[in-house]
UniProtKB/Swiss-Prot annotation:
Name of the protein in its database record: Polyribonucleotide nucleotidyltransferase
Amino-acid positions noted as binding Mg(2+) in the UniProt annotation, renumbered to this chain: D488, D494
NCBIfam families: polynuc_phos, PRK11824.1
EC number: 2.7.7.8
Subcellular location: Cytoplasm
Organismal lineage: Bacteria, Pseudomonadati, Pseudomonadota, Gammaproteobacteria, Enterobacterales
Assigned keywords, A-Z: Cytoplasm, Magnesium, Metal-binding, Nucleotidyltransferase, RNA-binding, Transferase
InterPro entries for the chain: ExoRNase_PH_dom1, ExoRNase_PH_dom2, ExoRNase_PH_dom2_sf, KH_dom, KH_dom_type_1, KH_dom_type_1_sf, NA-bd_OB-fold, PNPase
GO molecular function, one term: 3'-5'-RNA exonuclease activity
Record-annotated KH domain positions: 555-614
Amino acid sequence: MLDPIIHKFKYGQHTVILDIGTIARQANAAVMVSMSDTTVLVTVVSSNQVRLEQDFFPLVVNYQERTYAAGKFPGGFFRREGRPSENETLTSRLIDRPIRPLFPKGFINDVQVVATVVSVNPQVNPDIVAIIGVSAALSLSDIPFFGPIGAARVGYIKNQYVLNPTTTELSNSKLDLVISGTESNILMVESESCLLSEKEILDAIIFGHEQQQIVIHNINKLVKKVGKTKYSWNEKEVNISLKTYLSELYESRAQDIYCFFDKKERHAQVDSIKKDIVKTVLNSYQHAAVDEKEIMYLLNYLEAQSIRYRILTNKLRIDGRSQDTIRKIDIKTGILPRTHGSALFTRGDTQALVAVTLGTERDAQNIDGLTGIRVDRFLLHYNFPPYCVGEIGVIGAPKRREIGHGRLAKRGMLAVMPNANEFPYTIRVVSEITESNGSSSMASICGTSLALMDAGVPIKAAVAGVAMGLIKEGNDFVVLSDIVSDEDHIGDMDFKVSGSRQGITALQMDIKTDGITYDIINIALKKAKNARLQILDVMEQIIKFPNQEISKFAPRIYSIKVNPDKIKDVIGKGGSVIRSLTEETNTIIDIEDNGIIKIVALDYDKAKQAIRRINDITANVEIGAVYTGKVSHIVEFGAFVTILSGKEGLVHISQISERRINKVTDYLKLGQKVLVKVLEIDRQGRIRLSMKGVHQVSA
């Protein structure tokens, strides 16, 4: 059994500690990794044998947060962790993306990676810690893996790049970029930025990749010291004669495929050709051990190679476009009459129906994370139903991909969203992907920008998104603009960029091959900018600025400021005043400790009524002023009259009339409206009123 090993190294402003051989020793490998008191236990387990009929790589990555890590109890009735949170799902994807390409081609053994957060420092996000731990565990294990990888978070504060900034530092940063890669290649980038230039983003990528070499160097040192020998596995042998025969058959029919630029027609033609070839091959190999699955696998490979070769040799793409051509765009806004804002964005065969709902602070999402409760007043949800690609499937809770695409679209919009002072609404956006042929997350960003403008949300600028692709063979490469799903599938890079005319708001990059240079990334960024500006030109022809008025179906929010000392008067004893106020005016009233009162109403007149009542309640009674009041109580020596929605004063019997009155009830009745003049307010706040000398006809 391995004796425990502790390895430490400095990483930016933090110290990383790798503990190997202490915990979870029955896994293929386990590492307890810490960075400034944020600790993640990472385990990796693999099966030595392939499951029967297995034909894909079953990698599962689970990132999970334990509330005890922050000294907290889980919420809910059962007081234990349940289904993964959105953050856990997103971090699982963040770990999966850079490690998946580094397993050997053809390797299809089961592999499970589990990263469990067991201690958390609120200033250190566990995601980078988890990626470092996963890299170390896979590299040290006997599982075939071409690592290690590094990971870094890059901030941009006061025009300086900052390695692994703290949570506090990140709140003042114009950039939140996570990058992961090997010693020579970048594999994954995920970023959110405040309208930074292409050069600033590229420099951040270079900075992050250079800095993470510290992690790779230290893991390599550990591997040399205690790394296990990788176990052998049997890669399925390719039937060379079958592959050659299929290549001849496919090439003879390939030109028939490229006659069809429409996705459905092309797929139908491809399926027809493949069926013909399968039938031909099975008849030719009647006595050989060849099955249909093997034939289809090779045909799919040949199809991909054919498309790649066609693009590299400067021929048209599979849908007839040149390298930099954007698909035809069609836009409609305000198409859902009862929603608060809507847009239909169509780009080629990809379509997003986007709806906006405006709500109050009460509609905001309270997220109880490891580092505390935070309030999110901008929600963006992405739905990808099976019908959008012409398939039948199960419809239920959002899958990992939907959660990830929704978060990417949200990141693309955050830089231009108004703050609560500028627009005091909670905003929910839902993007329904009704057709899909690539770049649906980027279509969601375009549709969201349009729908928010239609809803009258004062976003700072229009935002568009585009997905770029790469085909690379040796030193030859082509960067493609606005890729379709087939190009994404056979390509070497998925590069999504969103932004306004002023700069980039979000970037997501996944690379499937080696040899991606900074020059290639720079070219992709420049081409993405050109594509983005073209899309914005089309969007601005439909709607250039946010509507001045919100929908008549949306709630109106009005704010008034009162003396904080008067808040208790608005609330009343046991909430009696505010309760009656909301019921009578059919409004929602929220009161803040600083004296800001927000009135939410669908009816403007009701809102005015509530504001008038609140102003009356919080107004100071002035001596000598005349008020309209209501008789609330009658006694022998006079009557109590309520003025200014709740303040009560006494009209003595001698102050009711110029004439002598023997009985108050002969002159006044309960509920009667009267005009009264304030005579005096004593030290105890008691108000003396008079009806004498006040003309009562107008009361």
